[in-house]
């Protein structure tokens, strides 16, 4: 789990990025108990435990930097676990990466090409069981078009938000063995569908993560 805003960081206060990747068992024991909460946090929660600090995300969207760090983590993992199930990278975003270089032809625009190239490099990282899979889910408080697992970029070209196309290009094509199982999560995905939801609602958000982390996909 990595957070990114003005910086890329571990949202788990007890586990620094330098210790990633981490096991589920380590994550399970890394919570902060109610005795460790600040007075402000105590006023805002009814839970006696907390795993994720959500208040550290602010400002920019340093997606390029985040994916650069994730690539190194995935590479290190695959070297140590060549026979494991391929890594799955799930990215939650509310908009366009803004740590990209300026477009050489239009200085008012950002150039997403370095991010596309980086994602393609990540997708090529593989174990003996297959390649890394990248999924993207976009969230917004603006009412707009909901797009689930588009097969063609034509399905999102009418969306004015440039992040719609960027996230499409970043996403992996859903592996064929996953398609039939997708119906069990309420998704009807055609062959060639991208592992990507734009302007997700809450139900789709939950199903996206259950689908993407389902152990029966292995």
Show which residues each predicted segment covers:
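Acidic, low-complexity intrinsically disordered regions
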Residues: 1-218
């Amino acid at each position: 789990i990595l957070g990114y805003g003005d910086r890329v960081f571990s949202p788990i206060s007890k586990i620094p990025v330098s210790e990633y990747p981490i096991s589920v068992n380590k994550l399970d024991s890394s919570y902060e108990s109610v005795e460790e909460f600040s007075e402000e946090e105590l006023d805002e929660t009814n839970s006696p435990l907390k795993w994720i600090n959500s208040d550290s995300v602010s400002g920019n969207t340093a997606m390029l930097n985040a994916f650069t760090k994730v690539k190194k983590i995935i590479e290190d993992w695959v070297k140590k676990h060549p026979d494991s199930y391929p890594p799955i990278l799930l990215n939650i975003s509310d908009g366009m990466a803004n740590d990209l270089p300026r477009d050489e032809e239009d200085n008012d625009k950002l150039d997403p090409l370095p991010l596309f190239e980086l994602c393609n490099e990540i997708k090529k990282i593989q174990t003996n069981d297959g390649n890394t899979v990248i999924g993207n889910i976009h969230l917004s408080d603006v009412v707009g078009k909901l797009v689930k697992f588009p097969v063609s970029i034509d399905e999102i070209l009418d969306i004015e938000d440039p992040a719609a196309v960027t996230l499409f290009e970043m996403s992996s094509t859903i592996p064929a063995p996953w398609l039939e199982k997708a119906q069990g999560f309420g998704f009807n995905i055609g062959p060639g569908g991208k592992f990507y939801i734009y302007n997700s609602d809450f139900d789709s958000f939950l199903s996206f993560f259950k689908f993407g982390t389902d152990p029966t996909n292995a």
